[in-house]
Amino acid sequence: MLILLMIKKIAQYCVSMGLIFLCLLAGINLQTWLGIAIPGSIIGLLILFGLMASGLVPVEWVKPSATLFIRYMILLFVPISVGLMVHFDTLLANLAPILASAIGGTLIVMVTLGLILDRMLKKGKKSCG
């Protein structure tokens, strides 16, 4: 009985990981085929989101591996952080534009989302009352 449960759990992880990697592969191939500047991983993420939002892929099918990726996400940033330290002098030389774009972009997103939410809430109140 325990072996069957283990096999079922392993199968769930395999299906989950397979779906995520198939969407990643589809995104990379689509990006290469179309020649657009959006990274293939982002396109794959949007494909996976679209499949889950439309109900073609139930969330439960993706959840095991997604939970695993989220749990160990910090480890995935270590190579990127080390790679940034190689170019520390370049980062330091461009610190002002980097900070300006990060802070400015954050403010633009916050204000835009605030305005959209405000309009949506006002429309919701008008239709209710």
UniProtKB/Swiss-Prot annotation:
Pfam hit, one: LrgA
Keywords for this protein: Cell inner membrane, Cell membrane, Membrane, Transmembrane, Transmembrane helix
Source domain of life: Bacteria
Residues passing through the membrane, by range: 10-30, 33-53, 73-93, 97-117
Membrane topology: Multi-pass membrane protein
InterPro entries reported in the protein's UniProt record: LrgA/CidA, Uncharacterised_UPF0299
Primary residence: membrane
Single GO cellular component term: plasma membrane
Cellular location(s): Cell inner membrane
HAMAP family: UPF0299
Name of the featured protein: UPF0299 membrane protein VC_1233
